[in-house]
């Protein structure tokens, strides 16, 4: 399955942040990326593991 280009990246943000995330995940978070502890407790990510 070919990787699709993330279409939810806002110009001016770091485009590399979108890689490896499902589309739409970033809209719920503030601009700074999650810390490692938050990532472990993130329910959306936990569902994918």
From Swiss-Prot:
Keywords: Sporulation
Cysteine pairings via disulfide bonds: none
Main localisation: other
One Pfam assignment: SspO
Any one biological process term the GO annotation gives: sporulation resulting in formation of a cellular spore
Cited InterPro entries: SASP_SspO
The organism's place on the tree of life at top rank: Bacteria
GO annotation, cellular component aspect: endospore-forming forespore
Induction: Expressed only in the forespore compartment of sporulating cells.
Region (Disordered): 24-49
Localization in the cell: Spore core
Family, as annotated: Belongs to the SspO family.
Protein name in the entry: Small, acid-soluble spore protein O
Designated gene of the protein: sspO
